[in-house]
């Protein structure tokens, strides 16, 4: 074994063409395709539901084309009427409630210092994925294309190229106050309880308007950014801000307007930024819209049709094995002192799992949509206002730990450090991640490792700073934190500067993977795979078996290497092969560049191979030559949990 990722995925990587309407494809996206078809059947057959009406309004292209740019008039007139900074802030308050970006982001979550829900304030205000795009030389070509794109779009509003120059110049100034991606991950630095009255002038006024008297305290995630953007909200920049606001109205609503406007916006955000040649089919984009506003209404029907209760029962058993495996490993850690080990076990004991679907569905009473395409933008305003008010209603009340923040039809998994729970929506609990008919080794190597990954986030470089109740305070001794950091530093070094195949073959300039930025996800992956193996051993032991007792069987994964089809594999080997199959993925190089700048996950090929190379059992399962790219010498392998 020289390359686990390609051993399982080589044929698929060589022959599979990424569909023209997406920048990435693989196992996650194949599951999303299936969930999308399932949701389409639900929405199509429920024309009088909220989802059905919203979907129909998006599909009514004749009315949308007739309406042209006019649906934006209420937003644009609001901005045109602004004559002072105070009026600008008032306009931002109204725009924010109806789904338009404003210079400061705000969301409601559990307070990391109490059990209440509280607003968190974050940096915002950019039209590019990250502040690095405005300052790093390797992104200057993209920045120039962005300015040209802003000009193209603002022409739909009758504005000239000078307006685009003003918008991008202001965004450069906004970006200068943004924290970098590594700093924004720091749980301690980004937790700053602040009195509303102590926020800098214009930001205070903005938040007073948005929060409507629900609280006198917020959490400032990036305090210096709030000071910075407040310093830009001045009378001499008023014209710049009004143009900026018009741009963000148009940018945010472009997909709801005529095909010409929608395609023009996609030409940059789809093609330039991600390399995607064509937009997704309209019905798919319509489903995205419906899922975004009434996803749990759809999810209730999705679960009834596509998620048997037996799958939930079996997943609970799998989670139990993973938790027991973590308990065993933590109990045996030689690098952690007994007192800290005990506190880690206390946190693990408080861990909760949400599987499949919520016990209580969201109530959408009061939200109504119209089916006509001429009402599409207004439908989105209504939906945004409903969700805005829904979140605002939580503030200063005990946080509801049972609430789901995703839909059952979402193909993903989540760990929430402020609640200490994981969420596994129904749509991810399908092959190749999970199947009730699959061999246990394959389920542990796929969904088991993903479960282990999510639990592992509770013990990664940031999650480990929260206790079992989701509160942010140090439960580590200095000695233990130093030992932890020593181990994680090796993982940072292993990933630092790695360049994904797509980018290398395209000859695109890049600094590669940022090992510090991706550390949390890499810790999650490392713990996930290692703990999945421990859990699989426990599963076998409960049945009176060991790894040596597992039968050899073929591993079925269409698109593997020729060698994959020639052999049968032990249980441990199939666990690793299932791990590799999960990470099957191809990405356009433009998207890989964007993700390395803004996404804390490493590229899939490295999540598979570098992580597996650190796990001792890989070398028991396969013969890995010392000169193989994925071989890691024993003294350099990282084991944390």
Regions found by a protein language model. Name each.
Residues 1-28, 130, 421, 426-428, ...:
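His/Glu-rich zincin catalytic helix
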Residues 1-3, 7-66:
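Active-site-surrounding "flap" and adjacent substrate/cofactor-binding loops of secreted or lumenal enzymes
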């Amino acid at each position: 074994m020289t390359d686990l990722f390609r051993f399982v995925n080589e044929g698929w990587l060589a022959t599979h063409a990424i569909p023209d309407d997406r920048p990435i494809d693989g196992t996650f996206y194949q599951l999303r395709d299936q969930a999308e078809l399932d949701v389409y059947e639900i929405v199509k057959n429920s024309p009088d539901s909220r989802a059905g009406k919203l979907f129909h309004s998006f599909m009514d292209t004749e009315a949308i084309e007739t309406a042209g740019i006019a649906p934006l008039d209420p937003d644009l007139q609001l901005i045109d009427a602004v004559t002072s900074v105070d009026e600008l802030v008032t306009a931002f308050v109204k725009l924010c409630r109806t789904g338009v970006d404003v210079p400061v982001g705000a969301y409601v979550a559990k307070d990391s210092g109490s059990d209440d829900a509280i607003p968190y304030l974050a940096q915002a205000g950019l039209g590019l994925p990250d502040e690095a795009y405005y300052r790093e030389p390797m992104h200057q070509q993209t920045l120039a294309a962005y300015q040209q794109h802003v000009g193209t779009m603002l022409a739909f509003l009758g504005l000239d190229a000078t307006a685009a120059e003003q918008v991008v110049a202001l965004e450069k100034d906004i970006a200068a106050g943004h924290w970098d991606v590594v700093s924004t991950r720091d749980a301690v630095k980004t937790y700053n309880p602040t009195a509303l009255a102590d926020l800098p002038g214009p930001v205070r006024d903005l938040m007073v308007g948005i929060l409507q008297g629900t609280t006198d305290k917020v959490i400032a995630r990036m305090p210096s950014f709030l000071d910075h953007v407040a310093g830009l909200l001045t009378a001499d920049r008023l014209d710049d801000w009004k143009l900026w606001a018009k741009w963000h109205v148009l940018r945010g609503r472009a997909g709801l307007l005529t095909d010409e406007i929608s395609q023009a916006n996609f030409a940059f955000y789809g093609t330039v930024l991600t390399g995607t040649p064509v937009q997704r089919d309209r019905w798919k984009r319509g489903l995205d819209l419906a899922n975004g506003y009434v996803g749990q209404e759809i999810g209730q029907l999705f679960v009834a049709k596509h998620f048997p209760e037996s799958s939930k029962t079996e997943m609970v058993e799998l989670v139990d094995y993973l938790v027991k495996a973590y308990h065993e490993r933590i109990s045996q850690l030689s690098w952690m002192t007994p007192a800290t080990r005990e506190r880690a076990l206390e946190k693990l004991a408080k861990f909760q799992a949400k599987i499949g679907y919520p016990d209580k569905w969201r109530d959408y009473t009061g939200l109504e949509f119209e089916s006509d395409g001429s009402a599409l933008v207004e439908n989105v305003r209504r939906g945004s206002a409903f969700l805005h008010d829904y979140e605002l209603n939580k503030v200063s009340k005990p946080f509801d730990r049972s609430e789901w923040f995703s839909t059952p039809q979402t193909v993903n998994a989540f760990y929430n450090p402020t609640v200490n729970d994981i969420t596994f929506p129904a749509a991810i609990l399908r092959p190749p991640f999970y199947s009730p008919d699959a061999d246990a080794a394959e389920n542990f190597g796929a969904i088991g490792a993903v479960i282990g990954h999510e639990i592992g986030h509770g013990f990664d470089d940031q999650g480990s700073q929260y206790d079992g109740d989701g509160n942010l305070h140090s439960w580590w001794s200095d000695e233990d934190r130093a030992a932890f950091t020593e181990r994680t530093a090796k993982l940072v070094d292993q990933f630092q500067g790695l360049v994904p195949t797509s980018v290398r073959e395209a000859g695109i300039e890049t600094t590669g993977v940022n090992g510090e930025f991706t550390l949390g996800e890499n810790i999650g992956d490392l713990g996930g795979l290692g703990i999945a193996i421990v859990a699989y051993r426990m599963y076998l032991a409960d049945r009176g078996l060991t790894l040596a007792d597992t039968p050899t069987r073929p591993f079925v994964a269409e698109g593997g290497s020729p060698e994959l089809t020639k052999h049968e594999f032990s249980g441990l080997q199939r666990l690793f092969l299932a791990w590799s199959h999960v990470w099957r993925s191809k990405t356009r190089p433009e998207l890989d560049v964007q993700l390395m700048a803004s996404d804390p996950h490493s590229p899939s090929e490295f999540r598979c191979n570098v992580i597996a190379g650190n796990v001792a059992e890989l070398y028991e399962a396969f013969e890995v030559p010392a000169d193989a790219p994925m071989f890691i010498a024993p003294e350099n392998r990282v084991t944390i949990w």
